[in-house]
Swiss-Prot record:
Catalyzes the 1,3-allylic rearrangement of the homoallylic substrate isopentenyl (IPP) to its highly electrophilic allylic isomer, dimethylallyl diphosphate (DMAPP). GO terms for cellular component: cytoplasm. Belongs to the IPP isomerase type 1 family. It comes from Salmonella gallinarum (strain 287/91 / NCTC 13346). This is Isopentenyl-diphosphate Delta-isomerase. Mg(2+) binds at E87. The active site is at C67, E116. The lineage of its organism: Bacteria, Pseudomonadati, Pseudomonadota, Gammaproteobacteria, Enterobacterales.
Amino acid sequence: MTEEHVVLLDEQDKPSGTLEKYAAHTLNTPLHLAFSCWLFNEDGQLLVTRRSLSKKAWPGVWTNSVCGHPQQGETTEEAIIRRCRFELGVEITDLTPVYPHFSYRATDPNGIVENEVCPVFAARATSVLQINSEEVMDYQWSEFKSVWKSLLATPWAFSPWMVMQASDEQARERLLNYCQR
């Protein structure tokens, strides 16, 4: 895979340039565009993944299915499909926005800052997973309500963006409705 960049955003969330992904994620991370996707199987179970220990930010932490950054000239939907294939080796369908205006800023234990405008989507897996171990060290298919209980009981075990997304009542309701259809 070629070197990834992030799309930098101005104060109005409009693209203002690009920066190499690893150079962007520092102690002073500029605002940039990202995405987050919650992937469900045909039984309505949620794929929860554990970030590889080689990840720069939040290594070894459990998170929602897949996250990443659209490249310049790429739609968010195209980026989600690309990262699902790269990280999980999976094809998806029924890509649906569930929290289109989510943004957050969080600092990991090593001081690395995430500062993202990060629309949240749900999607359905249509093929068997083929996990890229450089991205994902573990994974589990779980009932959404069970994951929600775990998020409430042990939020420190999960990525802050996952906790924040699921804590939004409207987004949580949309995810629950999505997994039940």
